[in-house]
């Protein structure tokens, strides 16, 4: 029984596959790749020939070859982030794999980078202009919850400096501060929350004075 064909690429999305066999091109515009190579498919508009990139080279690949002789990688950026594989992560981003894509748990690649303590991965993801800091997964956890729970104070600090929210509660009504497993993370989160609350109090006081002045 043959595998069902992969779903077509939506605009702005990239399909990623791992080659199970080497493909030898017959014409100059076809793409050569070897067993185990990662292929990024960017155009499936032609049903017979798909446009793909592998190791920085772009070319055409027979669609039936990809469907039958390659393994689909559903969340390559997440896999790279989980493993702390920086070169693969950069390659995914270079090939326009979406930085804010969600896996089955509703988590982003940033969440998994924070969960695994991969500071270098977090820093690279932060270079993406539209990276979403505060995405909550199906458990309601954000990247900040993950970093606090795992005790990675350096990553908590990075997230806070980038503007991650400390007031988001997960499905168990817990803030990132409630999940902090060491004093360093708790201290950073407390300080940030006190600063936020202080700024809010000051803002409210200014609004009150403005109202008094307008009377």
UniProtKB/Swiss-Prot annotation:
Modified residues (N-acetylserine): 2
All residue ranges annotated as the SH3 domain in the record: 12-71
Sites bearing Phosphothreonine, chain numbering: 201
GO molecular function, one term: SH3 domain binding
Positions of the UniProt region annotated as Disordered: 192-215
Subcellular location: Cytoplasm
SS bond list: none
Sequence positions bearing Phosphoserine: 203, 214
Gene Ontology CC terms, in alphabetical order: cytoplasm
PROSITE patterns per UniProt: ANK_REP_REGION (PS50297), ANK_REPEAT (PS50088), SH3 (PS50002)
ANK repeat copies, ranges: 72-101, 105-135, 139-168
InterPro entries assigned: Ankyrin_rpt (IPR002110), Ankyrin_rpt-contain_sf (IPR036770), SH3-like_dom_sf (IPR036028), SH3_domain (IPR001452)
Keywords: Acetylation, ANK repeat, Cytoplasm, Phosphoprotein, Repeat, SH3 domain
Main location as per UniProt: cytoplasm
Domain writeup: The SH3 domain mediates interaction with SMN1.
Its biological purpose: Induces bone resorption, acting probably through a signaling cascade which results in the secretion of factor(s) enhancing osteoclast formation and activity.
Subunit structure: Interacts with C-SRC and SMN1. Interacts with FASLG.
UniProt-recorded name of the protein: Osteoclast-stimulating factor 1
Organism: Mus musculus (Mouse)
């Amino acid at each position: 029984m043959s595998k069902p064909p992969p779903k077509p690429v939506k605009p702005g999305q990239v399909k990623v596959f791992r080659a199970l066999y080497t493909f030898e091109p017959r014409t100059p515009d076809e793409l050569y790749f070897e067993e185990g190579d990662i292929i990024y498919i960017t155009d499936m508009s032609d049903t017979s020939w798909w446009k793909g990139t592998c190791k920085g080279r772009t070319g055409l690949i027979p669609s039936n070859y990809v469907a039958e002789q390659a393994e689909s990688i559903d969340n390559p950026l997440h896999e790279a982030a989980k493993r702390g594989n920086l070169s693969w992560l950069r390659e995914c981003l270079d090939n326009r794999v979406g930085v804010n894509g969600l896996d089955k748990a509703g988590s982003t690649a940033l969440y998994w980078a924070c969960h695994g303590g991969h500071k270098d991965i977090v820093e690279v993801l932060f270079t993406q202009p539209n990276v979403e800091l505060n995405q909550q997964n199906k458990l309601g956890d954000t990247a900040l919850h993950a970093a606090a729970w795992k005790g990675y104070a350096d990553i908590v600090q990075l997230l806070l400096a980038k503007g991650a929210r400390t007031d988001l509660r997960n499905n168990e009504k817990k803030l990132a501060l409630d999940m902090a497993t060491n004093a360093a993370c708790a201290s950073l989160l407390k300080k940030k929350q006190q600063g936020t609350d202080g700024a809010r109090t000051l803002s409210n006081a200014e609004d009150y004075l403005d109202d008094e002045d307008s009377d």
